[in-house]
Amino acid sequence: MITTVGEISARRKTIILASCCLSLLIVSMDSTIVNVAIPPAIRTDLHATASQMQWVIDIYTLVLASLLMLSGATGDRFGRRRIFQIGLATFAVGSLLCSLAPDIDTLIGARLVQGFGGSMMNPVALSIISQIFVGRVERARALGLWGAVVGISMALGPIVGGFLIEAISWRAVFWINLPSARPPSSSRRSSSPESKSATMRDIDPVGQLLAVLALFGVVFVLIEGPGMGWTNPRILAIAAGAAVALLAFLRYESRRHDPFIDLRFFRSVPFSSATVIAVCAFAAWGGLPLHDVAVPAGGSAAIRQPTPV
């Protein structure tokens, strides 16, 4: 039997909102909680190089960002609750693999699995909230709480991560995801009714593939370039491939009726400015722990902080 929105009690709506916010909390917190584990716990235990430490942080957020829109469109087409629960299970499996990783390469691969699962949770959970809370006031409150959780989770990450590392081990920063990931999928009360979009958007696999190739190419060059050398043939080839993918993406999306990303948004100065500011802020947020590794002992005490201030 399909439950309609009108049949959902206020109590169940609250439980669903809490479940969606919890999923956002663990996904967003995982983008910062690992930062404090990099220097020096993971580096020492798994004998990681500078580039490998960067991949531990970047592969998660890269996969998460690359697949957000695809996951949202998939949820609209095949069912939001179904995709959300698949993402939750995938994220939990990735977290378990991270905690058991015997070497740095396995940890990087497990972080990729985490990012894949997280990409299915956040956009679909937001769609579920918008679907459940139909009233103008209650939807505004629900989305306001959803946005607040983002800031709270990113602030909690370094604090919780530092405590777990000191008290237990760096592996504990991944254990915390396992009990947190269980309630939304295991409780019927916290499960939202299955829903799909009335108007199906095209998934746009070509645009998605070009975007992923461009992003991965740029990140690979930035991470591996200093170690391999900027004139290394492999670096030059990947940089050229990323540039071609980016140009092809811009050309393809500008001519598509239902694009993966509507490029007209970037004509808006406020939108473009906010995007640039967000990119710079997150780059600084993720880069500070890695910079801490490079600063020699006795260096600037103001810079040698394991977490952003």
What are these regions (language model features)?
Residues 126, 178-197, 212-224, 240-256:
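C-terminal membrane-cytosol helix-exit motif in multi-pass small-molecule transporters
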Residues 2-190:
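Transmembrane-helix bundle of Major Facilitator Superfamily
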Residues 71-72, 101-102, 134, 191-194, ...:
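Short helix-capping/hinge motifs at transmembrane helix termini and TM-loop junctions
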Residues 166-178, 223-235, 303-306:
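A membrane-interface helix-boundary motif in multi-pass transporters
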